[in-house]
Amino acid sequence: MSDQHKATLQQANAAITAGDHEGFLACCHDDIVWTTVGEGSLRGKAAVRQWMRENYLEPPRFTVTRLIADGEHVAALGTLEIVTDGVAMPHAYCDVWRFRDGRMAELRAFVIPDSTRDA
């Protein structure tokens, strides 16, 4: 099951980088809980969709350096560039996803600015 969860996450990530929010959301449960540690939580696809519309005006650019799977969980570690007003800001991240019935049900995202690398 872990390999299937990894494949689903990779499919969802590909949709995000292509700007395909609906393709990403198709990999999620309707009652998804998306928590960015230190910022708050979104509940449900409608809330995630709205957040993406507001915050992913340009698709984020990210590189997954490691996927670690254990049972119903997959952790993705990597780097992320978020473009705001035409300026790419480098970040480091770790997303911990919980899967249910083959789809993403919960995210705990740890995202921090990374001034040690260039965008």
Question: What are the roles of these predicted feature ranges?
Answer:
Residues 44:
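Short, conserved phosphate/pyrophosphate- and ester-handling motifs at nucleotide-, phospho-/glycolipid
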